[in-house]
Every structure is written in structure tokens, then in C-alpha cells.
């Protein structure tokens, strides 16, 4: 009687081919995914890599603010923090604006529906009532699947999702969030950190000369 090993396994050939095809498909999928991550990463590792809309609906690249300190704020017109917060933002921008610093305001209506105005109306309201000169962008969503990508980056990188209006996030010249403040925190709590960051920017520019 011939040994069992002498009989050929006829079905092994097609199975091996199917396995090879499936393996190739899996490897291709993995490679495409890794390539996608490689190309996406440079566009999402900095706040300044995003584009947003201004109050008039025009596209603005945040790249123009790179190299400066930025205070990113979700603002609202009909909030109990509106008056004090806009005064604080105006003072900070007035004091540090000429020295590599910007306040970047993003209106949002998701917190107590306290921003019913249109983007243009918000800009006009802030200019007329508080004399602000810093950029006020298009009204956005911060919470949920329709959140503005630029602000979602702020939230994800800081691990601090705003719970109300006028949360303030300090972004360094490279586009990373380094500090945040809740709406009830006073100007005196923010000023030293902004001043320190601006001092570092000025010192670096002198060293690069």
C-alpha cells in the first residue's frame, strides 16, 4: 500500500493563489492607508495649517498668523461674559498687537444660543460697541460632527473642550496650544503668559539676525 504522502493535494494550488491575492489586497490597503497618514500629517499638526472663512465668507489661510502668538476665542454677543471678555480681548490686542500677537475670534451659537447674529453682524457689533480691531471670523460650530476643523484641532490638541462662550486658547508661533483660560478668569491671569511668549518670540528673532 502506497503511503498517504504520495497522493498529490490537488486543491492546494487554487487555495494558495486565492490566499496570495487576498494577502496582496490587504498589503495594498495597508500601504495606501500609511501613505494617506503620511501626507495628511503635515496639514494637521499646526493650527496655522488650516483655512477658515472671515466674517464676509472669504477664505483666509491661518498661515498668515504663523510665527506669532495667537489667542483663539469662541465669542458671543448675548452672553453674561460678553462685556467683560470683549474688554479684556481689546486690551490684550491693544497692548501686545504691535508685538507679534493676535486675538482670533470665532463666533459660535452653540452655548445657550447666545450668538444669534450673522457673522457680519457680529463683526459690526464688536467694532461699534467695543472698538475691537482684531479678526472676527465666520460663525462656526465647535461641538459635534460639523465642528470647524481649525477649532477642532484646538480642542483635540488641548484636550479641553469649551463648555461655554469665551474660552481662550493661547497658541504658540508653531501653531500648538500651550495654555487655556475659562471665561471667568481675569485679564491679569492671561497677560503674563502672553507677555512671556512674545518676549521669547522677540528674543528668537534677535538671535536669528
UniProtKB/Swiss-Prot annotation:
Its main location: membrane. One of its GO terms (cellular component) is membrane. It is found in: Membrane. It is an enzyme of class 1 (oxidoreductase). Its EC number is 1.11.1.9. Keywords: Acetylation, Membrane, Oxidoreductase, Peroxidase, Transmembrane, Transmembrane helix. It catalyses: 2 glutathione + H2O2 = glutathione disulfide + 2 H2O. It comes from the Eukaryota. It is a single-pass membrane protein. The modification N-acetylmethionine is found at residue 1. PROSITE patterns: GLUTATHIONE_PEROXID_2, GLUTATHIONE_PEROXID_3. GO terms for biological process: response to oxidative stress. The active site is at 79. Belongs to the glutathione peroxidase family. This is Probable glutathione peroxidase 8. The lineage of its organism: Eukaryota, Metazoa, Chordata, Craniata, Vertebrata. The gene is Gpx8.
Amino acid at each position: 500500500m502506497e503511503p498517504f504522502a504520495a497522493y498529490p493535494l490537488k486543491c492546494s494550488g487554487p487555495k494558495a493563489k486565492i490566499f496570495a491575492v487576498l494577502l496582496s489586497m490587504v498589503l495594498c490597503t495597508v500601504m495606501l492607508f500609511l501613505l494617506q497618514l503620511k501626507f495628511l500629517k503635515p496639514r494637521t499638526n499646526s493650527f496655522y495649517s488650516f483655512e477658515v472663512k472671515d466674517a464676509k465668507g472669504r477664505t483666509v489661510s491661518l498661515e498668515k498668523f504663523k510665527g506669532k502668538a495667537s489667542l483663539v476665542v469662541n465669542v458671543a454677543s448675548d452672553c453674561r461674559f460678553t462685556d467683560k471678555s470683549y474688554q479684556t480681548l481689546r486690551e490684550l490686542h491693544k497692548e501686545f498687537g504691535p508685538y507679534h500677537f493676535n486675538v482670533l475670534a470665532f463666533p459660535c451659537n452653540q452655548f445657550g444660543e447666545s450668538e444669534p447674529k450673522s457673522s457680519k453682524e457680529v463683526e459690526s457689533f464688536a467694532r461699534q460697541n467695543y472698538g475691537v480691531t482684531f479678526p472676527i471670523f465666520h460663525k462656526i460650530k465647535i461641538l459635534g460632527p460639523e465642528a470647524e476643523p481649525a477649532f477642532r484641532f484646538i480642542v483635540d490638541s488641548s484636550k479641553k473642550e469649551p463648555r461655554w462662550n469665551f474660552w481662550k486658547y493661547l497658541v504658540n508661533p508653531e501653531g500648538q496650544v500651550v495654555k487655556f483660560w475659562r471665561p471667568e478668569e481675569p485679564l491679569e491671569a492671561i497677560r503674563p503668559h502672553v507677555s512671556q511668549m512674545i518676549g521669547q518670540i522677540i528674543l528668537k528673532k534677535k538671535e536669528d539676525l
